[in-house]
């Protein structure tokens, strides 16, 4: 599946239009030499159903989508809602994408189905209302989520 078909779309009341800035960023990212270093590796992405996490997961999956097994990048998408993840990653479902269903705060207690080489922590509260109405709790959640992600990385010897 071509990333630009599904990722970079902005919905308006009138219609759906491509987000050309995001499409250009994705195309530029797919050319980065760094991606070659991830070939054959497993990357766990927290917040994989959010804008940043989802886009990163799709880029990694798209990069490794060819026939060459040495070029594959396995993505473990850490998500809270499996059904949402299935919808967002429809068309990317392959042996290179698995889910770890949990809240970021409990990630440290989970076990991945394979060795995790790298982790991208993209989970975050995105509701402005939460920041305004419950600032302490919101920051507490962010700190504890990051602590849990770091503990997972330590326990699993993530690079």
Region roles according to the model:
Residues 42-66:
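N-terminal Rossmann NAD(P)H-binding glycine-rich loop of SDR-like oxidoreductase domains
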């Amino acid at each position: 599946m071509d990333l630009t078909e599904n990722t970079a779309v902005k919905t308006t009341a009138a219609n759906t239009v491509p987000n050309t800035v995001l499409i250009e960023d994705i195309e530029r990212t797919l050319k980065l030499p760094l991606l070659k270093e991830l070939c054959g590796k497993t990357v766990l992405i927290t917040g994989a159903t959010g804008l940043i996490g989802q886009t990163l997961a799709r880029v990694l999956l798209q990069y490794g989508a060819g026939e060459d097994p040495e070029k594959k990048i396995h993505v473990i998408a850490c998500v809270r809602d499996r059904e949402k993840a299935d919808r967002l990653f429809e068309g990317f479902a392959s042996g290179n994408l698995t889910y770890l269903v949990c809240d970021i705060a409990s990630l440290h207690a989970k076990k991945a189905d394979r060795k995790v080489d790298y982790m991208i922590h993209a989970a975050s509260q995105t509701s402005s209302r939460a920041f305004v109405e419950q600032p302490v709790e919101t920051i507490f959640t962010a700190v504890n989520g990051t602590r849990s992600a770091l503990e997972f990385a330590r326990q699993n010897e993530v690079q």
